[in-house]
Amino acid sequence: MKNSELIGRNIKIIGDGFNPGIVNEFFLKSSKLIGDDLQIKSNSITTPQFVQIFTDQFVLLCLPDHFQYNFIKDENAGKRFVLGFSKKFSVVNYRAIGINFDYVVKDEKELSKELFFKSESPIFREFNTESSKFGGFLTKKYRNSIINLTVKPTTGIKPDGNKDDLLHFSFNFHTELLGIKALDDIKKSVMDFDKFHSYCDKIMNA
């Protein structure tokens, strides 16, 4: 697919027992999770039950049942952060990790129809119109995870203010986490981040 664009990437870890109330600038810097020179932006939010921290390098979301690290730049620093943060909360009952990549591509020349329309299906025939858009959900095992790909039609706004028809490709590499192996399995998944990213690029450039 031509002109696909990566618009987001994040790592989300689900578990019971995170303590958002301690996740602040002092905690992150004293724990060596971020450097002393990295500035926490003023629009960051810190409460006992909800934390959202904005920096030029990442956005961090932490709630009692999960945390999510959204990459802005420096993927290697991000991977180190996720591993270090997970260890700081080693008492958490970890349940799953998801590594996620989001892309958009212009839905030109009925691309969504070319990819997903099934002419032999009576359901699809009901949507065989000029205004119809199509998507899909695909899943399979990949390395130590299950890859889930969701494709949805959406719209964007061009610089001139007009709408742009797009397809949103959302890749999720999901791994269940069990007991005493949880931190080891988190590390395995995080170490596969680059392989997951490359595999998504391969699919999007096919």
Residue ranges and their predicted role:
Residues 108-170:
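Aromatic/basic-lined ligand-recognition segments
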Residues 3-16, 99, 103, 128-135:
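Short glycine-/aliphatic-rich beta-strand segments at the starts of folded cytosolic domains
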Residues 51-71, 75-79, 148-171:
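Amphipathic N-proximal alpha-helical interface segments
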Residues 1-71:
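N-terminal low-complexity, intrinsically disordered segments
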Residues 13-16, 70-73, 103, 171-177:
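Short beta-strand-to-loop capping motifs
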Residues 145-206:
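Mixed-charge, glycine-accented linear interaction segment located at domain edges/termini
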Residues 19-24, 76-80, 109-111, 179-187:
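Short, conserved charged micro-motifs
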